[in-house]
Amino acid sequence: MSKKVTETVEQLVTPILNEMGLELVDIEYVKEGKNWFLRVFIDSDDGVDIEQCGVVSEKLSEKLDEVDPIPHNYFLEVSSPGAERPLKNEKDFVKAIGKHVYIKTYEPIAGEKQFEGELTAFDGTTVTLSVKDRGRQKTVAIPYEKVASARLAVIFF
């Protein structure tokens, strides 16, 4: 049911976001404890503010009431993806070039399955990172199809 709910919500929210010049980053429909949460993450090139999240929440709530795809009570949350935004598609990887990222792979690449470093290039088939290895910078090329998950990473100095 979770996949069907997220697909329905995506169909409902996309026109709202397009009208406002925003983009859909992700949708989560999860149970935490006794409560269900429908989380919609939105963004734009300029970021999003609380007013935009509120408008999307109100408009989406109206659509959800009409279609009623969820048979029980739930909490609707609309927010930005935050500082550690997930990279979900090719467009996200292109936008993240020059930024610090964290990537997990399905299988080992050069003996590792987790990488953190600067995303230096993405050509649609290969993600190229500059990572520190024992105090030295090295380049790692990760086949895009081997990426299990990726997100922006915050660097603490």
Swiss-Prot record:
Chief subcellular location: cytoplasm
Highest taxon listed in the record's lineage: Bacteria
A cellular component term, taken from the record's GO annotations: cytosol
Keyword Cytoplasm: yes
Keywords for the protein's UniProt record, in alphabetical order: Cytoplasm, Ribosome biogenesis
Record Gene3D superfamilies: Ribosome maturation factor RimP, C-terminal domain, RimP-like superfamily, N-terminal
Keyword DNA repair: no
Record InterPro entries: Ribosome_maturation_RimP, RimP_C, RimP_C_sf, RimP_N, RimP_N_sf
GO biological process, one term: ribosomal small subunit assembly
Family: Belongs to the RimP family.
Protein name listed in UniProt: Ribosome maturation factor RimP
Organism the protein comes from: Geobacillus thermodenitrificans (strain NG80-2)
Gene name as annotated: rimP
